């Protein structure tokens, strides 16, 4: 038969199909197996109404056969096969999907039948074979026909169709693998282990058995005796047909069919984790987009979680065929710790089936999965506080980062999952903190730093403790940005005890402080002059009880923010907090400095001012520029 040309933009278009659409050559096997699965689906559907098919569901299978000597890989199915006309139209016209046409012809009611789950949409997957093969031969016999046909093509030069011999209904796709090139070892695809790996990676959950002949070696009794009279064993290697894929994914099973123990075993094997997950989340959604998901909350942080090598995201499947192994769009950033799989027959894939065409579908799934994860974590917090605190210790940073990057109702969703120390041992949520607030407490007090013990001992916290008000210790660098995003919780404003007015003074007390400030103005100006640019201003404090001094800030940049920017390589060096030195007018150190200044001993007053400033820096967790000078100052006053 004369060679035919492809009925499309011919050579140019086929070249694009082969070289431009797919990013990974190894997916050729996924595409050919998916076509075989579709062919079996069609004949299985036919068998529901045609008893002449003569095949039970358990008879269908897909066979993968490598031949190193011939350098071929054959994918054989016993599906519906193709007529000569179908060969010409389906394989001769690029981007025509016979599977999609079949699905359209069924009508909506038939598509809902659980036996039908057509994968193919675009009619280009077959041509991915040319990424690894320099020639492809298709031998097929259609159901209801006694004649088989052979389709042969070496790529863009066209194809031929001739009659062939085939005893059974179905299709054999024979790929003649290319010779090895520099940087591309095509021979690897002829190895059993490589083909099995690709099947398990991309087609593990295709509903039909994918079988291969696998060599198995074992010690058997040879029937002879050794010198000790014991049975003599010999190694025997035999070839057995082995089903490579799992077929029915665990997430497609009901709770009765798949226990939590089985799901946990799946998690450990799938994600290479020796520890049980903290939570198993199952989702079965139907509506605008139907999908199933099986999610897990790990019990510990992956080694690369907070590095640039982190690989968050869920595995994405379309009708059991893996599309992406790390789809980050399926999870809101705050839930990036979750592992698992999502499978949907309704995804609008692009032509290579390597990504989605409409992110609206992903956003819908991600929003729903976010709600499910939030619900599960809330339940865990309520029912198993110890386990939840274990989760929070591992992944609290992820929640906080998500709270900062998300906007609007996402912040409201995340805020109730966060925990903060109010003592060295006690953790509370924002809701628990507000519920426990005394009636006279109007603000949510918090302090930021890297150490709970230091934050609890801040001088600014003493007055609050005396009144029975707890302080939230925020030890993550992200916490301050999170609070700044929220502004308030349950109509209670946040108050940073290092920067904000605590709001505890009465009008009479405020006037008293202002009067003292005016009275000691000359001394306070002297302290400011002594310290120079190290502080922006000096004032008497309304926050201190027994402590002599504290360091506060004004404006939008706090000490924690300054430290954060200081730790970033290449960050601007001019981002600095506006420092304010606050002094306790009732403390004996202040009184001693005041007496020295009044007596004209400005050297002593200056030394005390410098020591107080150094103490304020140390209390705030700031380094001293000259520790030796500080030590010398202390010694002069002893």
Region spans (language model):
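GHKL/Bergerat-fold ATPase module in large chromosome/replication-associated machines
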Residues: 118, 136-158, 178-638
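GHKL (Bergerat-fold) ATPase N-terminal catalytic module, capturing the glycine-rich phosphate-binding loop
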Residues: 1-189, 197, 220-221, 438
């Amino acid at each position: 038969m004369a060679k035919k040309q492809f009925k499309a933009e011919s050579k140019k278009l086929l070249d694009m199909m082969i070289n431009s659409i797919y990013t990974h050559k190894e997916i050729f096997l996924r595409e050919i197996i998916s076509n075989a699965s579709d062919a079996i689906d069609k004949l299985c559907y036919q068998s529901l109404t045609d008893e002449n098919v003569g095949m039970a569901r358990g008879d269908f299978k897909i066979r993968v056969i490598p031949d190193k000597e011939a350098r071929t890989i054959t994918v054989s199915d016993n599906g519906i096969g193709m007529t000569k006309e179908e060969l010409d139209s389906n394989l001769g016209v690029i981007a025509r999907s016979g599977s999609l046409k079949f699905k359209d012809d069924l009508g909506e009611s038939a598509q809902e039948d659980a036996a039908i789950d057509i994968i193919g949409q675009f009619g280009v997957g077959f041509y991915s074979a040319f990424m690894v093969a320099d020639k492809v031969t298709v031998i097929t016999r259609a159901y209801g026909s006694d004649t088989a046909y052979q389709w042969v093509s070496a790529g863009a030069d066209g194809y031929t169709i001739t009659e062939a011999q085939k005893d059974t209904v179905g299709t054999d796709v024979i790929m003649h693998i290319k010779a090895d090139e520099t940087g591309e070892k095509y021979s690897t695809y002829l190895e059993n282990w490589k083909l099995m790996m690709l099947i398990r990676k991309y087609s593990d959950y295709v509903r039909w058995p994918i079988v291969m002949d696998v060599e198995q070696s074992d010690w058997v009794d040879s029937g002879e005796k050794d010198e000790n009279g014991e049975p003599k064993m010999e190694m025997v290697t035999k070839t057995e047909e082995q089903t490579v894929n799992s077929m029915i994914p665990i997430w497609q099973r009901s709770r009765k069919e798949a226990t939590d123990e089985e799901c946990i075993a799946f998690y450990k094997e799938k994600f290479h984790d020796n520890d049980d997950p903290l939570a198993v989340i199952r989702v079965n959604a139907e509506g605008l987009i139907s999908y199933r998901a099986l999610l897990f909350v790990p019990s510990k942080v992956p080694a690369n979680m907070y590095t640039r090598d982190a690989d968050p995201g869920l595995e994405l499947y379309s009708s059991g065929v893996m599309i992406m192994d790390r789809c980050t769009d399926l999870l809101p950033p705050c839930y990036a710790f979750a592992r698992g799989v999502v499978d949907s027959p309704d995804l609008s894939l692009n032509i290579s089936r390597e990504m989605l065409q409409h992110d609206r579908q992903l956003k819908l799934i991600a929003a729903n999965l976010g709600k499910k994860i939030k619900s599960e974590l809330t339940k865990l917090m309520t029912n198993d506080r110890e386990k939840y605190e274990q989760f929070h210790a591992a992944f609290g940073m992820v929640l906080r980062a998500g709270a900062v990057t998300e906007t609007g109702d996402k912040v409201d969703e995340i805020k109730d999952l966060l925990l903060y120390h109010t003592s060295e041992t006690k953790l509370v949520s924002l809701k628990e903190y507000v519920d426990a607030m005394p009636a006279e407490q109007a603000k949510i007090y918090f302090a930021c730093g890297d150490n709970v013990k230091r934050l609890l001992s801040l001088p600014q916290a003493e007055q609050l403790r005396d009144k029975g008000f707890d302080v939230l210790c925020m030890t993550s660098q992200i916490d301050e940005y999170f609070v700044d995003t929220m502004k308030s919780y349950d109509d209670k404003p946040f108050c940073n005890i290092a920067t904000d007015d605590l709001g505890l003074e009465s009008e009479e007390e405020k006037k008293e402080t202002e009067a003292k400030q005016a009275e000691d103005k000359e001394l306070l100006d002297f302290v400011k002059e002594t310290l120079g640019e190290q502080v922006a201003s000096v004032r008497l404090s309304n926050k201190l009880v027994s402590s002599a001094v504290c360091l506060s800030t004004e404006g939008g940049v706090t000490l924690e923010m300054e430290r954060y920017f200081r730790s970033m390589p290449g960050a601007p060096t001019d981002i600095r907090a506006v420092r304010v030195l606050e002094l306790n007018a009732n403390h004996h150190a202040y009184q001693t400095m005041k007496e020295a200044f009044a007596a004209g001993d400005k050297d002593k007053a200056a030394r005390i001012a410098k020591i107080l400033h150094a103490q304020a820096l140390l209390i705030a967790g700031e380094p001293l520029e000259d520790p030796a000078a500080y030590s010398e100052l202390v010694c002069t006053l002893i």
